[in-house]
């Protein structure tokens, strides 16, 4: 069993102009960490500022959520970049959110890449190194996917003096190697509240998930990613938060 209570993190600040995404005001009181979009895959300066202020109000730790420059595709399309360009887009976005945090007199606690950039980071050592290099400038941890081989990533991040936070997903199906089932495949995302609730509690209590073929996979995760995109999911986040608080 996990010795330390896992935290809950959620993607936030993903509205853009007149386009509304998520229910940040209703979810924020129930999570520990807010992954705030930085303007490339979603968000804008006003949304970033409002979301930072909301996180400050509820004493939620703030993380930068950089992605590929792809508003139309919501950052879920992989866009070819050189390692140097990866470092530059991460520096640009994290630097912007850090400035917003300074304006609101709150610290920036960590970085968690978004969507396709997150997936590419987990698949490509060159991209992972490029992101570590950028994050090292800020002296804060990088959040990545907990897998069956956390040590591999720890060894690389240590070269850049970047601490790692490992996360697991409450609403995603896992493969035997600890990677997430691609969204292009059936059953990659869980939609039934009880399935999501049960997986979250299994991670929090036993540090494990059941994979696509039914085997149990151990995951050393510090935090669980949840989503609050609709009224039903907001209620679910509340249930998960209350259950973990009792552990």
UniProtKB/Swiss-Prot annotation:
EC class: hydrolase
One Pfam family linked to the record: LamB_YcsF
Reactions catalysed, as given in the entry: 5-oxo-L-proline + ATP + 2 H2O = L-glutamate + ADP + phosphate + H(+)
EC annotation from Swiss-Prot or TrEMBL: 3.5.2.9
Cross-referenced InterPro entries: Glyco_hydro/deAcase_b/a-brl (IPR011330), LamB/YcsF/PxpA-like (IPR005501)
Keywords, sorted A to Z: ATP-binding, Hydrolase, Nucleotide-binding
GO biological process: carbohydrate metabolic process
A single GO molecular function term of this UniProt record: 5-oxoprolinase (ATP-hydrolyzing) activity
PANTHER family: 5-OXOPROLINASE SUBUNIT A, UNCHARACTERIZED PROTEIN YBGL-RELATED
Assembly description: Forms a complex composed of PxpA, PxpB and PxpC.
General function of this protein: Catalyzes the cleavage of 5-oxoproline to form L-glutamate coupled to the hydrolysis of ATP to ADP and inorganic phosphate.
Family: Belongs to the LamB/PxpA family.
Protein's name in the database: 5-oxoprolinase subunit A
Name of the gene this protein is made from: pxpA
């Amino acid at each position: 069993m996990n010795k330390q209570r896992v935290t809950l993190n959620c993607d936030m600040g993903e509205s853009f102009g007149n386009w509304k995404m998520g229910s940040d005001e209703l979810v924020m009181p129930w999570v520990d960490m807010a992954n705030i979009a930085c303007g490339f895959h979603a968000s804008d300066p006003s949304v970033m500022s409002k979301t930072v202020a909301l996180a400050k109000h509820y004493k939620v730790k703030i993380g930068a959520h950089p992605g590929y420059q792809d508003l139309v595709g919501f950052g879920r399309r992989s866009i070819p970049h050189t390692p140097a360009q990866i470092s530059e887009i991460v520096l640009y976005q994290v630097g912007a959110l850090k400035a917003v945090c300074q304006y609101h007199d709150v610290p920036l606690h960590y970085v968690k890449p978004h969507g396709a950039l997150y997936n590419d980071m987990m698949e490509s050592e060159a991209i992972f190194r490029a992101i570590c290099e950028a994050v090292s400038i800020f002296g804060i941890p990088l959040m990545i996917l907990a897998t069956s081989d956390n040590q591999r990533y720890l060894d690389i991040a240590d070269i850049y003096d970047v601490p790692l936070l490992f996360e697991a997903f409450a609403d995603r199906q896992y493969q035997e190697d600890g990677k997430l089932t691609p969204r292009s495949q059936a059953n990659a995302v869980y939609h039934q509240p009880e399935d999501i609730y049960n997986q979250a509690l299994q991670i929090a209590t036993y540090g494990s998930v059941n994979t696509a073929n039914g085997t149990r996979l151990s995951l050393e995760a510090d935090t669980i990613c949840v989503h609050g995109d609709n009224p039903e999911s907001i209620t679910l986040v509340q249930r998960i938060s209350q259950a973990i608080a009792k552990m």
